């Protein structure tokens, strides 16, 4: 009789007031009838219209659950629950404990009211919970950070870590992937290729095993001095341009490594080459790109220097000999001022595609680097083979009816290595003028001194003579 009264009273109590959460949410504490869950009674669950059963949990001393894997630093304390269910009036109470996950099941689980602390439990768990093998074993899945290890689930209705970490969800560790050797690691503004191949970048290209380190505003070659280039260089894979048709110019892919043209363009050498020459190209006015316009040039015409000059004689001269070649693509038509014994400038056909790093060997001296942004010059060291210059077979035929000329806009400043003597001449002239002026000043002072001395002597003599004359005059009287 007492048991029936207790059952009726428990059924009438609202489910939301049957549990309370302590200040530290470690486990569930029931304030009414703590031993109600230990009674094996029939009809202690009320069937509902949706064919689900209402579960009630009794308190058991908390059992610590310690994770062996993952990154949780706190020990999760949970409460073991012995649930008794009676679906459709049948007592099938089966408490179980398992280590894996199971199929989802629909049930209504009695939970504690929500607390204000970040680690409190939710008032009502979702109706579909993954990790429950049957209706009699409600579980809460413990979050894990390692997805490769099978997650552990504890029989608990409250999971409250010591720290304020949320108890639901999946924490995925952000891993840093280090590329293997030979993989290009791209960053914003910098690209470092693996070996030798120059990869396009925004502002900076640094090859690992190449010969040029291109930075913003400065191109430093391997052996030949330092060349100040335009701000920014953007390069791409090397290629060839088909310029047989002036209206159709396409960039066809070729080798991905810079082409060495020292053996293809032999130039006779007649002296030592300048290795420390510095060429400075001003970029106050950007070079206008001639993309979309055919490059005018006489058909099958090659201009070569008539007489080779020495390095010293041509280091300060402006190169006027040009040659039109379109074997490698480039961005604009820019005459470059190399300092070699046989100066030669290659004016390449314009295109709007990014140009590759072309260390074209001219006459045993610096090469040319043309970009799509602004004028860029690059000097590379190389050895030119001795022999006559012959380029008639590789010349490109360009129609002579074009109305545009080679782009020569911009200001070019040639910096030579010869010593400048006008300053010394000016110093000598000023020194001579100073010496002459001081001499004249001293002479004038001496003249004034002599005149003053003579005047002083004459004054004394006049007084004596006056006295003598006066004496004689008085005596006569």
UniProtKB/Swiss-Prot annotation:
<keyword id="KW-0812">Transmembrane</keyword>
<feature type="compositionally biased region" description="Low complexity">
    <location>
        <begin position="85"/>
        <end position="97"/>
    </location>
</feature>
<feature type="region of interest" description="Disordered">
    <location>
        <begin position="239"/>
        <end position="366"/>
    </location>
</feature>
<feature type="compositionally biased region" description="Low complexity">
    <location>
        <begin position="310"/>
        <end position="326"/>
    </location>
</feature>
<feature type="region of interest" description="Disordered">
    <location>
        <begin position="378"/>
        <end position="398"/>
    </location>
</feature>
<feature type="compositionally biased region" description="Low complexity">
    <location>
        <begin position="348"/>
        <end position="361"/>
    </location>
</feature>
<feature type="compositionally biased region" description="Polar residues">
    <location>
        <begin position="298"/>
        <end position="309"/>
    </location>
</feature>
<keyword id="KW-0732">Signal</keyword>
<feature type="signal peptide">
    <location>
        <begin position="1"/>
        <end position="18"/>
    </location>
</feature>
<protein>
    <recommendedName>
        <fullName>Uncharacterized protein C11orf24 homolog</fullName>
    </recommendedName>
</protein>
<feature type="topological domain" description="Cytoplasmic">
    <location>
        <begin position="449"/>
        <end position="477"/>
    </location>
</feature>
<keyword id="KW-0325">Glycoprotein</keyword>
<dbReference type="GO" id="GO:0005794">
    <property type="term" value="C:Golgi apparatus"/>
</dbReference>
<feature type="compositionally biased region" description="Polar residues">
    <location>
        <begin position="253"/>
        <end position="288"/>
    </location>
</feature>
<dbReference type="GO" id="GO:0005886">
    <property type="term" value="C:plasma membrane"/>
</dbReference>
<feature type="region of interest" description="Disordered">
    <location>
        <begin position="79"/>
        <end position="103"/>
    </location>
</feature>
<feature type="topological domain" description="Extracellular">
    <location>
        <begin position="19"/>
        <end position="427"/>
    </location>
</feature>
<feature type="compositionally biased region" description="Low complexity">
    <location>
        <begin position="378"/>
        <end position="393"/>
    </location>
</feature>
<feature type="glycosylation site" description="N-linked (GlcNAc...) asparagine">
    <location>
        <position position="77"/>
    </location>
</feature>
<dbReference type="Pfam" id="PF17823">
    <property type="entry name" value="DUF5585"/>
</dbReference>
<keyword id="KW-0472">Membrane</keyword>
<keyword id="KW-1003">Cell membrane</keyword>
<keyword id="KW-1133">Transmembrane helix</keyword>
<feature type="transmembrane region" description="Helical">
    <location>
        <begin position="428"/>
        <end position="448"/>
    </location>
</feature>
<dbReference type="InterPro" id="IPR041056">
    <property type="entry name" value="DUF5585"/>
</dbReference>
<feature type="glycosylation site" description="N-linked (GlcNAc...) asparagine">
    <location>
        <position position="51"/>
    </location>
</feature>
<feature type="glycosylation site" description="N-linked (GlcNAc...) asparagine">
    <location>
        <position position="300"/>
    </location>
</feature>
<dbReference type="InterPro" id="IPR052660">
    <property type="entry name" value="Erythrocyte_Invasion_ImmMod"/>
</dbReference>
<feature type="glycosylation site" description="N-linked (GlcNAc...) asparagine">
    <location>
        <position position="40"/>
    </location>
</feature>
<keyword id="KW-0333">Golgi apparatus</keyword>
């Amino acid at each position: 009789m007492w048991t029936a009264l207790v059952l009726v009273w428990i059924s009438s109590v609202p489910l939301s007031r049957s549990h309370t959460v302590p200040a530290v949410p470690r486990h569930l504490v029931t304030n009414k009838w703590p031993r109600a869950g230990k009674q094996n009674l029939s009809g202690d669950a009320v069937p509902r219209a949706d064919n689900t059963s209402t579960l009630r949990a009794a308190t058991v001393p908390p059992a610590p659950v310690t994770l062996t894997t993952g990154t949780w630093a706190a020990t999760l304390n949970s409460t073991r629950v012995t649930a008794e269910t009676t679906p459709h009036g049948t007592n099938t109470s089966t408490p179980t404990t398992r280590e894996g996950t199971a199929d989802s099941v629909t049930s209504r689980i009695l939970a504690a009211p929500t607390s204000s602390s970040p680690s409190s439990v939710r008032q009502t768990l979702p109706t579909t919970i993954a990790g429950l093998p049957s209706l009699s074993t409600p579980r809460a899945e413990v979050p894990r950070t390692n997805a490769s290890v099978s997650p552990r689930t504890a029989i608990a209705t409250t999971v409250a870590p010591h720290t304020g970490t949320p108890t639901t969800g999946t924490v995925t560790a952000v891993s840093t992937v280090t590329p293997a050797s030979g993989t290009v690691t791209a960053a914003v503004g910098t690209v470092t290729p693996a070996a030798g191949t120059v990869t396009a970048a925004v502002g900076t290209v640094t090859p690992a095993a190449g010969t040029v380190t291109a930075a913003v505003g400065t191109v430093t070659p391997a052996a030949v001095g330092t060349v100040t280039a335009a701000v920014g260089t953007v390069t791409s894979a090397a290629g060839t341009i088909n310029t047989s048709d002036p209206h159709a110019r396409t960039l066809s892919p070729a080798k991905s490594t810079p082409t060495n043209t020292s053996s293809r363009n032999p130039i006779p050498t007649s002296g030592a080459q300048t290795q420390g020459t510095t060429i400075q190209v001003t970029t106050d006015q950007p070079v206008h790109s001639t993309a979309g316009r055919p490059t005018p040039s006489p058909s099958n015409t090659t201009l070569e220097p008539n007489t080779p000059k020495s390095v010293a004689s041509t280091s300060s001269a402006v190169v006027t000999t040009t040659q039109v070649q379109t074997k490698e693509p480039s961005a604009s038509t820019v005459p470059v001022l190399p300092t070699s014994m046989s100066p030669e400038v290659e004016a390449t056909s314009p295109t709007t595609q990014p140009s590759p790093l072309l260390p074209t060997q001219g006459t045993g001296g610096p090469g040319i680097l043309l970009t799509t942004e602004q004028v860029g010059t690059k000097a590379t060291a190389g050895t030119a083979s001795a022999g006559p210059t012959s380029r008639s077979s590789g010349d490109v035929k360009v129609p002579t009816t074009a109305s545009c000329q080679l782009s020569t806009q911009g200001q070019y400043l040639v910096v030579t290595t010869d010593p400048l003597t006008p300053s010394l001449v000016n110093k000598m002239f000023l020194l001579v003028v100073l010496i002459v002026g001081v001499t004249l000043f001293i002479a004038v002072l001496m003249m004034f001194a002599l005149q003053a001395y003579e005047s002083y002597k004459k004054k004394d003599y006049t007084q004596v003579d006056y006295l003598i004359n006066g004496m004689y005059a008085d005596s006569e009287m």
